[in-house]
Design a protein with these regions (language model features):
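N-terminal alpha/beta PP-like core and its mobile active-site loop of ThDP/TPP-dependent enzymes
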Residues: 1-322, 435-437
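Short acidic loop-to-helix transition motifs that present clustered carboxylates
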Residues: 27, 48-53, 76, 366-368, ...
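A short acidic, amphipathic alpha-helical/loop segment
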Residues: 33, 81-82, 213-220, 348, ...
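A general structural motif
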Residues: 47-48, 107-109, 176-191, 250-251, ...
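Thiamine diphosphate
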Residues: 96, 104-111, 369-517
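Short, well-ordered beta-to-alpha junction loops that form the rim of enzyme active sites
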Residues: 157-160, 206-207, 232, 362-366, ...
Length: 517
């Protein structure tokens, strides 16, 4: 048995059974070890951003880490953007990064780099295997760090540690520390503060507090204590749809966000951070609440958020029978016809969404109406990029489909963002994943046109336009998808889009719709 075999055994002993990979020469012993472990599902990504993004989507839907396999520093660097999104989503992930043999590093071969320096900003934990004898403690430490609390870990595996001989052992399960107990003193303080600020209290939820069972508790608190419930701008995962309490999403634009929060005197955070502006703008605030708004943390990431909400509900006197408002029927919206628009797509997808679907939203500006409509759709899970790094949508949908093969995955994807990791379509085809990708083909970086206005530039010239528009030539998404092995078709009318969506939802995927808007 060599170190690579033992590393596989540690992962499998702890139910890490999927490895998203783009290996190179330094990882060949680990690839050979994986070949001897049929219990491990190995999924190839043709670009490392697909690998890390898929691991993110998988983790969000399972609350468990997958492994990734990346080739030295440059391979890791190619995957950093979606590691950033995963870190912001607080997704558990174990990145295995191969490196040169330890004795080869002083020779400064072409692929030698500072892997620790590259990994650290996008990881919650970074470790290096010191040798074959260190495989078990290092791998167990990486696994433990990925879940307590959940986050991104990176384990560097030198080639000589992978090929070095080790004694044959059977690794056991890593014992994880339970989440910290609810702090009842904090609960009491927040309950008193809620009572002292009637009708002027907000609560921001994320993580486990955005799951259906926790949202039911927050719904009762909201209706029984006049607390306004919010979600963050970027949502890692939220369970939405008819019958579920629907938090109001804090808007992305600073002016709209500050207006929404202007009357809040007390903001309670449940697994969330205080909302701040995405960027700094001249003359606009960075904090979105008033300076005199009191901000209190009920429970942080890694704590038992549902238990904290239950304790708070009891402390403010909310009965389990307290009713709350939840969407029960789709609003009376006319069926649109003629030229396809982003609103028509949002309305059609929300109406037709299958029960228990998973929506991965990276449509950026084009699908903003969908989130509001999704409260009235069939019950589903909703996810989006959380770190502002584009190129996560197609990989995230890929990972979610592997995590939940019995559920339909809908990827709402901007054309500009999709091009960052278009290779993920090939993985969907190879793995026969049930994903419907809807490309919002507006042939521009629309969000950046808006950002130009946000900084005071209302009219742009030819140079700026050439950096912000995606025409001359226009992207042919049908051809791109077919080249990756994914069936695809184009729609430019509402009628054509509805017909294609009905067809795509009626059979297993993958399928791509280029929606020209």
């Amino acid at each position: 048995m060599n170190g690579a075999d033992l590393l596989c055994d540690v992962l499998l002993a702890n139910d890490v059974t999927v490895c998203f990979a783009n290996p190179g020469t330094s990882e060949m012993h680990f690839v050979a070890a994986l070949d001897r472990k049929p219990q491990m599902r190995c999924v190839l990504g043709l670009f490392e951003g697909v690998v890390t993004g898929a691991a993110d989507g998988y983790a969000r839907m399972t609350d468990r880490p997958a492994a990734t396999l990346l080739h030295t520093g440059p391979g890791l660097a190619n995957g950093l953007a979606n590691m950033h999104n995963a870190r912001r989503a607080r997704s558990p992930m174990i990145n295995i990064v191969g490196d040169h043999a330890s004795y080869h590093l002083p020779l400064d071969a072409p692929l030698t780099s500072d892997i620790e320096g590259l990994a650290s900003p996008m990881s919650n934990w970074v470790g290096r295997v010191k040798g074959p004898a260190d495989i078990v403690p290092a791998a167990e430490a990486a696994f433990r760090a990925s879940l307590t609390p959940p986050g991104v870990t990176t384990l560097i595996l030198p080639a000589d540690a992978a090929w070095g001989e080790v004694a044959a052992i059977s690794p056991g399960k890593v014992k994880l520390a339970p989440p910290p107990a609810v702090d009842m003193a904090v609960v009491h303080t927040i309950a008193e503060a809620i009572r002292a600020a009637p009708d002027r209290v907000g609560m921001v939820v994320r993580g486990q507090a955005a799951r259906a069972d926790a949202l039911e508790i927050t719904g009762r608190i909201s209706s029984g204590s006049d607390v306004r419930l919010f979600s963050e701008v970027l949502i890692a995962r939220m369970q939405r749809g008819r019958g579920r309490f629907a938090p109001t999403r804090i808007p992305y634009p600073v002016d709209a966000a500050t207006a929404m929060l202007r009357d809040i005197d007390l903001l309670v955070l449940v697994g969330a951070k205080e909302p701040v502006a995405f960027f700094a703008y001249p003359g606009k605030p960075g904090r979105l609440v008033r300076d005199d708004c009191k901000v209190l943390l009920l429970a942080a990431h890694g704590q038992d958020l549902k238990a904290a909400l239950e304790a708070l509900a009891a402390e403010v006197g909310i009965k389990p029978t307290q009713q709350f408002a939840a969407a029960t029927a789709f609003p009376d919206e006319p069926t649109l016809s003629g030229r396809l628009t982003d609103d028509a797509i949002a309305l059609s997808v929300a109406r037709k969404l299958p029960a228990n679907a998973i929506v991965c939203d990276e449509a950026v500006t084009s699908a903003r109406r969908f989130f509001a409509l999704s409260a009235f759709a069939a019950p589903h899970d909703y996810m989006m990029g959380t770190g502002g790094s584009i190129g996560g949508g197609i990989p995230m949908a890929t990972g979610a489909a592997i995590a939940c093969p019995d559920r339909k995955v809908i990827n709402l994807e901007a054309d500009g963002s999709g091009m960052y990791t278009v290779q993920g379509l090939w993985t969907q085809a190879r793995e026969k994943l049930d994903v419907v990708t809807i490309i919002f083909s507006n042939r521009t970086y629309a969000i950046l046109h808006g950002e130009m206005k946000n900084v005071g530039v209302n009219e742009i010239g030819e140079n700026a336009r050439r950096m912000l528009d995606l025409d001359h030539p226009a992207l042919d998404w049908v051809a791109l998808a077919k080249g990756m092995g994914v069936e695809a078709a184009r729609a430019d009318t509402c009628e054509r889009f509805d017909a294609l969506l009905d067809s795509a939802l009626s059979r297993p995927g993958p399928f791509l719709i280029e929606a020209v808007i």
